[in-house]
Swiss-Prot record:
Circadian clock component involved in the generation of biological rhythms, in particular in rhythm stability, period length, and temperature compensation. Behaves as a negative element in circadian transcriptional loop. Residues 1-153, 214-311, 381-447, 524-590, 665-694, 889-908, 975-997 are annotated as: Disordered. It comes from the Eukaryota. This is Frequency clock protein. Residues 239-261, 277-294 have a biased composition (Low complexity). Residues 410-421 have a biased composition (Gly residues).
Length: 997
């Protein structure tokens, strides 16, 4: 316990060290309970070590505590002065400690003594001060002082964490960049990829062209080589096994082919064990059956089509609808197109591969196997042999796989609706009967296989459904048919045949795709059935225009051309053209047939949102994987302005594929490079034009013309100088013998002496009559102007020089060459053409008034009927009345416009010819009042037709020779003229009787 002196000492303020910091509130080392217990433990351990060194074998005391090892339970030992409360009280009351003295370094451990563990006894093996876990005091002192000096080490750790975070982010960006492999669809066909860092653009294009030709030529050779190797390997193995078995019939041979697969052992069964037994066996199989069974297992495991493998391709709803429509239409057309599908040619069977190898003797053929489909029950009156032969011929002709005909045997591998691998053996003995049906192979379930429409129709008919007539020629009916018509098939059946379950689409989505995208199907009202409209071609989409023709197999092309006469004709013309080109020696390299365009990935460089934009050509962008590009934050579009974005353009790689005449360039090209330039492997550039001409800037006028002069507005001397053309000596193809009056009218006369200037008389009626508003007949005049210009002697010198130049042919050739090009460059601008503007001086001007122009003849209206004609139909009268009313309204508006345009027209009398005003009064005006109502209507119509004429009548109906402006206005406003009483009767109507007294 602490005494009173300690208490008085604890009341004083704690002392400070040399740096001004208060000393730690700790007790002195001599009063520390922890150090006391440590000393006891150290002394006990030293006694044990010394006794063991002297050979004393007495009982060894167990240490009460360990200085280093403590249990995590938190319990303390039963010691005298190990009370924590008293320890803290003593430490708080005696905070003075000597830090400068190295011998008085106090312990920082609290007084919680834990129990010993079994591992703590290991410390007793080391002598005092030699435990590697605890360095000497000097080392501890230095480390403690360093910790005090650097009290805040969290800043150092924070800086390290920041550096690691930045490095981790950079590594993630590089990993995303290297994951851009291009297309998932063509990942298996990838051949190699390169990256270009410091290569010039021209050399880079040469390298790309060379590698394209290499990759295109490698496709055919690699396929043939791989097939030859496989055939050679299997053939050698089979024949080596055959030799060993023939030589050693009674014993096993080490060179015989062992059974190295569980599938092979299961397939062969007991015969496989018997084949490798030491003694002769009656159940030993033949060589052909053994090799065939092993080849079946190998081909089954190896010939899994890519269509059955999972493909994680990101497609939009629009693309998925197109794919659904293509799959459904393929059942009826046998053809499929589009960028999402790719034809996988069927691998020929192993027997055909063995036969094709010339150096290896073919083993005996296995017995014929059954067909893919089950036998359909024959109806009465059908010949089985005829059906079998026709079925075999159909299968052989429509097969989508490779066909090999050897010795009268046709082997078709991987054809349409599940007839892949069918073998029709014409030389088989008649006694051999093939089984009814063979097992299903993986290639038979390939969704990308070639469909045979005839077999699909037979299958639908076999199910009891009435299918439509398929081959209806090229005519296609787009009109809807009646619901009770033939040809309706359940939509669920077609979905199963097309294997649409592999696309993960719902029936409602399929109905929506058919109704929106297809023009060949008709859905029923309930949506359960579907009908094919007919024809041999499917729906054509806009994305099918850029489809690569290389995706179609030769057999598919034959099928398509065979079903269409136009296609067959086109194919024959193409073959003839190719043969002529080959005969003339004008064959082109494979790289010339494909126009290579680099592919640019348009993505925004935002870390939160990325978008994929469609660009480049249709044939190249089909191979961009949207799933890979959507995760990229690199901008390849070239629209950036910072240096960092320019550098990102060249981070991608150039990927080449097996047998493809294109490459995927994810690095892009600079924006100033023209995409129309094509570079071949020989380094020749198809784009014409030298470097100097390419560097020029094409100068055009405001109208878009690249000519330096305007032939219709500039003078002939300047035009002749700019075009190097002499008007006095035209070419032979131009004849100027004829006389053109247009040239005399529009070419102004030239005269060098102003005193001898003569004004030529104008022709009659130089300007025709115009119907513009505000133009009067008196506005007819002419102005004669005499101008003076300065004749430049330089133009004459240039003209004489151009006529005597010897390079006229070269200049014409250059002009023709510039015209043929799509974007002609302007001819070189001469220094002499940059002239000052011409100054025109007006010497004299005369104003001549011409005679007023004659007005056009007045418009006349002749009614389409006479008094002799009688109408019985009232509807005709109504239609005539409507026409007359419309014409009256038009005449009223014309009259108002004429008065506004010619205000003094009403003041002067207008004299007209009397012949125009004369008319038959007996037939037109005078009528008997005893006529009926219908004749009154006719007379009213006739009266209004007469009023439209510029004519006035008096009381007895005689015509007048003079019509005043007021009368004309009255007539134009459709007011009736004076009757027998001489007064106006208001507006005329069709019900009035016009009579004279």
């Amino acid at each position: 316990m602490a005494d009173s002196g300690d208490k008085s000492q604890g009341m004083r303020p704690p002392p400070f060290d040399s740096r001004g910091h208060p000393l730690p509130r700790r007790a002195s080392p001599d009063k520390s309970i922890t150090l006391h217990n440590h000393r006891l433990a150290r002394d006990a351990s030293s006694r044990v070590i010394s006794s063991s060194a002297l050979g004393v074998t007495g009982p060894q005391p167990q240490p009460t505590s360990s200085p280093t090892r403590r249990d995590s339970s938190g319990e303390s030992n039963d010691t005298g002065q190990s009370d924590p409360k008293s320890w803290f009280d003593q430490s708080n009351r005696n905070p003075v400690a000597a830090f400068n003295d190295e011998s008085n370094i106090m312990e920082v451990d609290p007084p919680f003594y834990q129990k010993e563990t079994d591992s703590s006894n290991e410390d007793s093996r080391y002598p005092p001060g030699r435990n590697p876990s605890y360095p000497p005091r000097d080392t501890q002192t230095q480390g403690f002082r360093a910790t005090v000096a650097h009290s805040s080490s969290a800043d150092d750790f924070r800086s390290v964490i920041d550096d690691l975070t930045v490095e981790n982010k950079r590594l993630k960006e590089e990993l995303k960049r290297y994951k851009q492999f291009g297309s998932d669809m063509m990942r298996k066909e990838k051949l190699f990829e390169i990256k270009v860092h410091g290569l010039p653009r021209r050399k880079k294009r040469e390298l790309e062209a060379t590698l394209r030709e290499f990759a295109a030529s490698l496709g055919d050779s690699s396929e043939s080589t791989s097939q030859r190797r496989k055939a050679g390997r299997h053939g050698k193995a089979v024949h080596s096994s055959g030799v060993s078995l023939s030589k050693h019939d009674s014993s096993s041979s080490s060179r015989s082919r062992p059974v190295d697969s569980a599938y092979a052992s299961m397939s062969t069964g007991r015969s496989s064990h018997a084949a490798h037994s030491s003694g002769p066996s009656l159940g030993r199989p033949s060589l052909s059956s053994k090799s065939t069974s092993s080849q079946k297992v190998e081909s089954y495991l190896r010939d899994t089509p890519d269509g059955l493998l999972p493909h994680h391709v990101v497609m939009t709803d629009k693309e998925k609808k197109k794919l659904v429509v293509r799959r459904l239409e393929q059942l009826f057309t046998g053809k499929i197109s589009g960028r999402n599908m790719q034809r996988i040619p069927s691998i020929p069977s192993m027997d055909a591969a063995l036969v094709s190898e010339g150096t290896i003797m073919a083993p005996p053929r296995p017995p014929p196997e059954g067909s893919r489909e089950a036998c359909i029950q024959l109806q009465e009156g059908e010949n089985p042999e005829k059906i079998r032969s026709s079925k075999g011929a159909t299968s052989a002709s429509n097969s989508g796989g490779d066909q090999t005909e050897v010795g009268g045997t046709v082997t078709a591998g991987g054809d349409g609706n599940g007839s892949g691998g069918r073998t029709v053996n014409n030389t088989s003995p008649p006694g051999v009967i093939a089984p009814d049906q063979r097992p299903t192979r993986p290639r038979d379930l390939d969704p990308d296989r070639v469909q045979i429409p005839s077999e699909n129709m037979d299958y639908i008919r076999h199910l009891g459904l009435v299918s439509p007539e398929f081959l209806q020629g090229s005519r296609t009916s787009y009109q809807d048919v009646a619901p009770d018509a033939e040809g309706w098939v359940y939509l669920n059946l077609l979905c199963n045949l097309a294997q649409l379950h592999m696309i993960n689409v719902t029936p409602s989505f399929i109905r929506q795709a058919v109704s929106e995208k297809s023009t060949k199907f008709q859905l029923s009202s309930d949506g359960r059935k579907i009908r094919w409209r007919g024809g041999t071609d499917g729906t054509k989409f806009s994305s099918d225009n850029g489809e690569d023709k290389s995706q179609k197999s030769p057999l598919t092309d034959d099928t398509e051309d065979g079903s269409d006469k136009t296609g067959r004709r086109k194919k024959q013309k193409t073959q003839q053209a190719r043969s002529e080109i080959g005969r003339l020696g004008l064959s082109r390299s494979p790289s010339d047939t494909f126009h290579y365009k680099p592919m640019f990935v348009h993505c925004h460089a935002s870390s939160a949102e990325t978008s994929l934009e469609e660009s480049a050509s249709q044939g190249s962008e089909d191979f961009v994987d949207e799933s890979n590009l959507a995760n990229s934050k690199w901008d390849f579009s070239g629209s950036g302005t910072t240096q960092q974005r320019r550098k990102r353009r060249y981070d991608g790689a150039i990927v080449y594929y097996t047998g493809a005449q294109f490459c995927t360039d994810l690095s892009g090209e600079p924006g100033d490079m023209s995409p129309t330039e094509q570079m071949t492997a020989t380094g020749e550039q198809e784009a014409s034009g030298s470097g100097d001409e390419a560097g020029r800037v094409l100068q055009r006028t405001l109208s878009g013309s690249s000519l330096l002069v305007r032939p219709l507005s500039d003078d002939r001397a300047r035009v002749a100088e700019a075009l190097d053309f002499d008007p006095q000596n035209p070419p032979d193809l131009v004849s100027d013998d004829g006389f053109s009056p247009n040239d005399e009218d529009f070419v102004f006369p030239w005269c060098e002496d102003p005193a001898k200037t003569q004004v030529q008389p104008l022709a009659k009626e130089v300007m025709g009559r115009s119907g513009l508003g505000g133009v009067l007949p008196d506005d007819h005049f002419a102005i004669f102007v005499t101008t003076r210009r300065v004749m430049r002697p330089t133009l004459q010198r240039h003209l004489s020089r151009s006529t005597t130049s010897e390079d006229t042919a070269e200049i014409i050739a250059e002009r023709l060459a510039s015209i043929r090009t799509s974007s002609p460059l302007p001819p070189p601008r001469s220094r002499n053409l940059i002239l000052a503007p011409l100054q025109i001086e007006y010497v004299a001007g005369e104003f001549h008034r011409l005679n007023p122009a004659s007005l056009p003849p007045p418009a006349m209206f002749y009614p389409p009927f006479s008094t002799d004609s009688s109408w019985d139909d009232g509807d005709d009268l109504v239609s005539v009345e409507e026409e007359v009313e419309e014409m009256e309204e038009e005449s009223f508006s014309e009259g108002q416009m004429s008065r506004r345009a010619n205000p003094h027209f009403s003041d002067n009398n207008t004299y007209m010819r009397k012949e125009d005003l004369a008319f038959d009064t007996e037939t037109d005006v005078r009528m008997d009042s005893s006529h009926d109502h219908r004749m009154s209507s006719d007379s009213g119509l006739m009266m209004r037709s007469v009023m439209r004429r510029p004519v006035a009548v008096d009381g007895d109906g005689s015509p007048l020779a003079t019509v005043t402006g007021r009368d004309v206005d009255m007539l134009h406003t459709s007011s009736s003229v004076a009757t027998a009483g001489g007064a106006e009767s208001g507006y005329s109507s069709s019900m009035e009787d016009v009579s004279s007294s």
